[in-house]
Regions:
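Conserved NTP-binding/hydrolysis module of P-loop NTPases
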Residues: 6-13, 83-102, 206
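Walker A/P-loop nucleotide-binding motif
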Residues: 39-59
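Conserved Walker B catalytic segment
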Residues: 42, 116, 120-162, 167-170, ...
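AAA+/P-loop NTPase substrate/partner-engagement loops
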Residues: 66-91
């Protein structure tokens, strides 16, 4: 943003540094997402660029950590086109392991049994967050169903929160992904609509503080 414009409106920080503007619809959706996480399964949060997906993801993670009733795990791999189910298993092992030498087995059968053992040891529901999930390969999306079931077989609960562009929701509606898409809970961050004037006023005031 131009320095001259900021000075004209009396702002001391850019729009990107402002807090998140919460509408009533957003607050309801945020609450519903948290309820869905407690129940487990695949949860998709989608929206266009700049709508607030990453901010919402961070808020969810922060709330869950503060409440300390659900364990938070997240995939940090940046190139989601190359993320596969092994990458997500690694993320879970890194975040859930209680011992430094608790390494993930490379053989699939042993890996899943070890994960089940960790689930029983931690004895809490788990939330696995994946940002930029619209770049995930369809095979990886399908594998998420098996990952959730592996945790359920150990009497655990796993929620996979996939965050991405509207393409993610379209992919999950594809008949080829019906196996996972039919079970997914979809949430969409929408436009402000009638709240736009309030948002502009709030944004300028927020950047003055």
């Amino acid at each position: 943003m131009e320095i001259e414009s900021m000075k004209y409106y009396g702002m001391n920080k850019e729009f990107s540094k402002a807090d998140y503007f919460e509408t009533e619809n957003y607050q309801n959706m945020f609450t519903n997402i948290k309820l869905a996480i407690k129940n487990g399964g695949l949860i998709a949060l989608t929206g266009i660029v700049g709508i607030g997906k990453t901010t919402t993801l961070r808020r969810l993670q922060q709330d869950l950590r503060e409440e300390n009733k659900i364990l938070v795990s997240k995939s940090l791999a940046t190139d989601k086109r190359h993320v596969n189910i092994n990458t997500l298993y690694t993320a879970l092992f890194v975040d859930l392991a209680t011992k430094k030498d608790d390494k993930m087995p490379t053989q699939a059968e042993k890996r899943e049994r070890k994960l089940q053992s960790l689930i029983k040891e931690r004895n809490k529901p788990i939330a696995l967050f994946i940002d930029e999930a619209h770049d995930l390969h369809p095979r990886t999306l399908i594998s998420l169903k098996h990952l959730v079931e592996t945790v359920e077989d150990a009497n655990g609960t796993l929620a996979v929160i996939a965050v991405g562009h509207p393409k993610l929701a379209n992919d999950l509606r594809n008949p080829a992904l019906e196996e996972i898409g039919a079970r997914a809970k979809l949430f969409e961050l929408g436009a402000l609509g009638v709240n736009s004037p309030k948002f502009i006023e709030w944004l300028i005031n927020s950047c003055k503080n």
